[in-house]
Amino acid sequence: MPPPLQAQRLLLSHRRLPSPHLRCFTAVSSLPSAPAKTVAAAAAHAPSSILSIRESLLSGERTAAEITAEYLSRLRRTEPSVRSFIHVADAAAEREAEELDRRIATEGLDAVGPLAGVLVGVKDNLCTANMPSTGGSRILDGYQPAYDATAVRRLREAGAIVVGKTNLDEFGMGSTTEGSGFQVTTNPWDDSRVPGGSSGGSASAVSARQCVVSLGSDTGGSVRQPASFCGVVGLKPTYGRVSRFGLMAYASSLDVVGCFGSSVVDTATILSVIAGHDKMDSTSSSHDVSDYKSELVPLDLLESKPLNGMRIGIIQETLGEGVETGVISSIKDAASHLEQLGSVVEEVSLPSFSLGLPAYYILASSEASSNLSRYDGIRYGRQVSGDDLNELYGGSRANGLGHEVKMRILMGTYALSAGYYDAYYKRAQQVRTLVKKSFKEALERYDILVSPAAPSAAYKIGEKINDPLAMYAGDTMTVNVNLAGLPALVVPCGFVEGGSAGLPVGLQMIGSPFSEGNLLRIGHIFEQTLQNYSFVPPLLAES
């Protein structure tokens, strides 16, 4: 087995073979060292994992109340800069932590669940009882559900403490979190840059260690792109793996509840809790749920070639025009590192890949035009008076919904209209079938497929807000996975220049339906041999 330090340092570059459709990578160079400031921050602010929190509670070293106080203190210091949360439930979190401590003292740690004392951020399009749930929209300002979304309920039952509701692009429609009806979230690596979206608040909260883990939703990349931008782990499960009950619908055939963590182990732990069939969601699967964390192998038990015999395909269409040079280099280095770990890595073409983006926006907007028709401004949100019901509805929607949401509703209504249904919606569904077929055929040849999670690192706030086509192009790497209903994991794999300490880049790993366990196992091996999970943003060194 190679020495751990050597394994941490070695990321390998590539050599292209002549075939335009199939290329292999060979190991020839090394991973750049992490920026000095980043390493210093990591030493000063070691991330508290789910396991370390549980060990602290078990040993009596810290109480749930003390852990909660530490996280809330950090949240208060960093939130004025990051603005990850729409609502912080600090008093409720403190009460829940004190109650946990009482139960631990009388019933024991096992009785309170595997996530006892773990602070969780919840994207604000997931319903939470006794806590505002706005979907990032002013049309739901003041809405407070009487129930928890299934994913939230399962976390609470496992002992987790919901610290608050994280910011998002309105109803999940956006890629920067600039589209929120409440505030603009910033990237903890550089507060002049976007955290990605639409789950930007959930990603930035984990990156800034304001909470241990967080929930997001992914309709076309809304977990994976922010994970890449913020340097955290993000998981989009298979469609149906996690219940959508209590998730405010954007595009029902594409929406998935996902999660963020500062490590693959934490992400796997959360998935084990929230996954599984739910009678409240007719699309949820009854496929068996594994104890995903128990399937992960620690670094000291890894073989010298832990991925020996595995075949990995790197999607050719994700390394071409429109992708930043630094991102391509990071992904090729990561692919070469996977090869060094024993796998065979080949570049493979998916001919229908480029068709996915326009098909996605037609389908997602069409479903949104139906799903959002339920919001009328009558019981909550911004209500505008009118002479009749139609004027009241129209005025309230015009005043309560943001520009991007209105634009997508119009696009979807147009695509569904009688004169254009066949030309747009029906054709987009045919493209979706082609995309599914392409992935199915590729995943019959390869164990997983890999690509960048985004064509760039995090860009400046305001840089693309007035250019919707440029914004939509940022989803190129991710939307096809939603069209195919597949699971995907994003793990930090390197840095590009930018900010004071570099900007993170994420590697997207894509698997067959319900292969989350395999993705997490590969991601964990990759993560351990690079130690990316110990990289924390400069914000924490400064706060």
UniProtKB/Swiss-Prot annotation:
This protein is called Glutamyl-tRNA(Gln) amidotransferase subunit A, chloroplastic/mitochondrial
Keyword Protein biosynthesis present in the record's keywords: the answer is yes
- Please state which protein family the record places this protein in: Belongs to the amidase family. GatA subfamily.
Tell me one GO molecular function of this protein: glutaminyl-tRNA synthase (glutamine-hydrolyzing) activity
Task: Provide the protein's localization.
Answer: Mitochondrion; Plastid, Chloroplast stroma
Q: Which gene encodes it?
A: GATA
The EC number(s) this enzyme carries: 6.3.5.7
Assigned GO CC terms: chloroplast stroma; glutamyl-tRNA(Gln) amidotransferase complex; mitochondrion
Is ATP-binding included in the keywords of this UniProt record? yes
Q: Which key words are in the record? A: ATP-binding, Chloroplast, Ligase, Mitochondrion, Nucleotide-binding, Plastid, Protein biosynthesis
